[in-house]
């Protein structure tokens, strides 16, 4: 039923008095209360707030995806202007009608790409399906358009990626596939739920610009859900701040950043990590914690030395990891992905070494290879003087008690059939460390340390927000008191307050127990805050490594400078200058089988600071 006379001129979406609740233990728990907002054509509305504040469930309610999950949604008005200019009341649409609205008129980019993509279909089939459904295109036309969309989101070897499955792509590449799928039908409204969380800063900058270009081209309204205030400053026209299910402040991006009125908004802004805040400091520094009573009370920097002199706890030499690509009638291996190429580094007890680089640079593969989650084709991995890359599976399991992994995708790494208490207890049971009663107490302590409640132990993963699920994964990794923790984008899904709490927790544990961290991240501001040393990876190789202060304050390699220049600044008046990003040529790390790539040769430019020699920078900055 049309409602064209009820939607104000210029608006493409209007929501009035939205209330969302869930039933728990026969009680109605409110998730969103009395939320009202509108969205104009060509406008970007950023919805910000802490994990569990109601941001994502608001988006799911607009897409009518909460009913199947048991959500109770009530709304006085939820109007959408379709691409055809017809105005509809979303709450009145049948399930069949909503299938035509989703994708064509209103699309959503979800936070966790691995759980949003179908594992049994190729990337090309999934993008083409939406194009064929909403644009009446043939299969051939849809695949051509799918390839064009992958090119637009700057995926290298786009034609090859079309035939890949989601598990064969990195987290950042999967997110780019999701973005390509959402934008393929040119919707009237795009809802982006943390769309750049899994992306490195350079790809994030390119995706933000791509969304801006398509938004201008199609007069598309964008609802941008994020916890990254730097992204908000760069892309938003208006900002809606949510706290505990309610809108506490709304205004233009300049008003929110320069004259915030609500104490929570002021605390949120003050807690944002700023690149360059560590200038002149040698050691990691704690984050300020969000407090409504004392907004952004800064804790003193950690100046004690946590790195222990002596032998490294982990030593990696010339690590090589490659993945085969099959083709042809006989399905033979003809090419290989050179994911990691002759990588070497040491990790000392009590040290945090951060691996940074673009999506597909080999950061995550390096971390997984250290635990033999992927097999390496060369090199040595030595832990506490023992070579572990040749250990039998039985001996390797005992070793994993001392080396724990925090994965990038929290939902995919938790068993949906287990309560989170059982998931945290499981490693304790596998290694026979604690009896049942003591294990339960340990779980309660761990949940409290990561900002959750002991009673949460009886809930299941789907009952938590993305940020809460990541905290659960961190609690599980800490259960065994490991000597080394490999954290793969461990805090990228967390809002600034919880991220600060988790980083502070990791620093406390490092100080108390001498834990060494291999911190894999694309968030340069967090890396600057937590790291003792930083290694920059590009196309599977380390091109710069050194003390954090030297790498950030005096970057030598052009790629390192490029990464730092791409970091969004949480200041609307200091947006990055417009750059041509959409037609850049992205080099590929796929080579013919048997083809060898010249090794990067590092030269010393300062105490502990090494940079790739110019002759080995083979077209690093072609773009």
From Swiss-Prot:
Compartments, record wording: Cell inner membrane
E.C. number: 7.4.2.10
GO BP term (any one): transmembrane transport
Main location class: membrane
Annotated GO CC locations: plasma membrane
Protein name: Glutathione import ATP-binding protein GsiA
Presence of keyword Amino-acid biosynthesis: no
Keyword presence, Zinc-finger: no
């Amino acid at each position: 039923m049309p409602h064209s006379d009820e939607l104000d001129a210029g608006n493409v979406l209007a929501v009035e008095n939205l209330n969302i609740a869930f039933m728990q233990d026969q009680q109605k728990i409110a998730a969103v209360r009395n939320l009202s907002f509108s969205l104009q054509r060509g406008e970007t509305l950023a919805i910000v707030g802490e994990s569990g504040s109601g941001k994502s469930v608001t988006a799911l309610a607009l897409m009518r995806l909460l009913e199947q999950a048991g959500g109770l949604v009530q709304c006085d008005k939820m109007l959408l202007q379709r691409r055809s200019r017809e105005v509809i009341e979303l709450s009145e649409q049948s399930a069949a009608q909503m299938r035509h609205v989703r994708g064509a008129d209103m699309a959503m980019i979800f936070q966790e790409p691995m759980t949003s993509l179908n594992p049994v279909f190729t990337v090309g089939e999934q993008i083409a399906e939406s194009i064929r459904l909403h644009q009446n295109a043939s299969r051939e036309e849809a695949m051509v358009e799918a390839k064009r969309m992958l090119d637009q989101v700057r995926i290298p070897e786009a034609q090859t990626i079309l035939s890949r499955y989601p598990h064969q792509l990195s987290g950042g590449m999967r997110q780019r596939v999701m973005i390509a799928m959402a934008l393929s039908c040119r919707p009237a409204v795009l809802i982006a739920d943390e769309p750049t969380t899994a992306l490195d800063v350079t790809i994030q900058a390119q995706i933000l610009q791509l969304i801006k270009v398509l938004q201008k081209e199609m007069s598309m309204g964008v609802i941008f859900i994020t916890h990254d205030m730097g992204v908000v400053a760069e892309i938003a026209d208006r900002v809606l701040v949510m706290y505990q299910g309610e809108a506490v402040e709304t205004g233009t991006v300049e008003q929110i950043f320069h004259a915030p009125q609500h104490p929570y908004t002021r605390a949120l802004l003050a807690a944002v990590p700023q690149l360059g805040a560590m200038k002149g400091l040698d050691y990691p520094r704690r984050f300020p914690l969000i407090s409504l009573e004392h907004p952004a009370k800064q804790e003193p920097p950690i100046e004690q030395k946590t790195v222990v002199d002596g032998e490294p706890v982990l030593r990696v030499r010339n690590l090589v990891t490659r993945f085969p690509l099959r083709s042809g009638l006989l399905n033979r291996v003809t090419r290989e992905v050179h994911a990691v190429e002759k990588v070497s580094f040491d990790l000392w007890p009590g040290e945090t070494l951060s691996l940074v680089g673009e999506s597909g640079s080999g950061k995550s593969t390096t971390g997984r290879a250290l635990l033999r989650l992927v097999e390496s084709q060369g090199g040595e991995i030595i832990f506490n003087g023992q070579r572990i890359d040749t250990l039998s599976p039985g001996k390797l399991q005992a070793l994993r008690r001392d080396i724990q992994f925090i994965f990038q995708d929290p939902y995919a790494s938790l068993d949906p059939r287990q309560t989170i208490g059982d998931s945290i207890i499981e490693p304790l049971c596998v290694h026979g460390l604690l009896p049942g009663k003591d294990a339960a107490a340990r779980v309660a302590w761990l949940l409290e340390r990561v900002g959750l409640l002991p009673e949460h132990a009886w809930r299941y993963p789907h009952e938590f927000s993305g940020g809460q699920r990541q905290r659960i994964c961190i609690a599980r990794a800490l259960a065994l008191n490991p000597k080394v923790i490999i954290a793969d984008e461990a805090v990228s899904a967390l809002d600034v307050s919880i991220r600060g709490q988790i980083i502070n927790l990791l620093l406390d544990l490092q100080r108390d127990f001498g834990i060494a961290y291999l911190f894999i991240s694309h968030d340069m501001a967090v890396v600057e805050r937590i790291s003792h040393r930083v290694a920059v990876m590009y196309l599977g190789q380390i091109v710069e490594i050194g003390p954090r202060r030297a790498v950030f304050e005096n970057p030598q390699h052009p790629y390192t400078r490029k990464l730092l220049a791409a970091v969004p600044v949480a200041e609307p008046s200091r947006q990055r200058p417009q750059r041509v990003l959409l037609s850049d040529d992205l080099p590929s790390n796929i080579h013919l089988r048997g083809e060898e790539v010249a090794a990067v040769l590092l030269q010393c430019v300062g105490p502990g600071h090494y940079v790739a020699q110019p002759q080995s920078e083979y077209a690093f900055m072609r773009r």
